[in-house]
Amino acid sequence: MSIWVLDNAAGTFTHTEFGPYAGWTARTLTVKKDETANIAWTNVDGRVSVWNYELDSAGYSQITYGAFSGWTAQGITDSADGSACVLWDNVNGSASLWGLDNGTGAYTHHEFGPYAGWTAMAVSAGP
């Protein structure tokens, strides 16, 4: 994966490359007002990792969650405050929505279901 940053004043690009990382796939990238970005990754073993990337310094911190038996991350997005939200789906028909604190690794969650025959598919957060 590569992140390209445009400097409008200078008309130049800088870029940083990541990976490849065996078993990991970059899922989403969200750029926030404070010139940081959240990059969400999923692993084939069920883990989820959220990277907080500093666009001006190419530095980053990351927090990894899971894997959790029976649960699969179905969607990852950023909320209006810049924190990540993860939608998990369970083989029993339950869904869980996590709000992550990117700085501490703490999370809050709400679980729904189980709902027989239904699968959670995507998550989106508004302003």
Predicted regions and their residues:
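Trp/Gly-enriched beta-strand/coil motifs that build multi-repeat beta-propeller-like domains
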Residues: 1-127
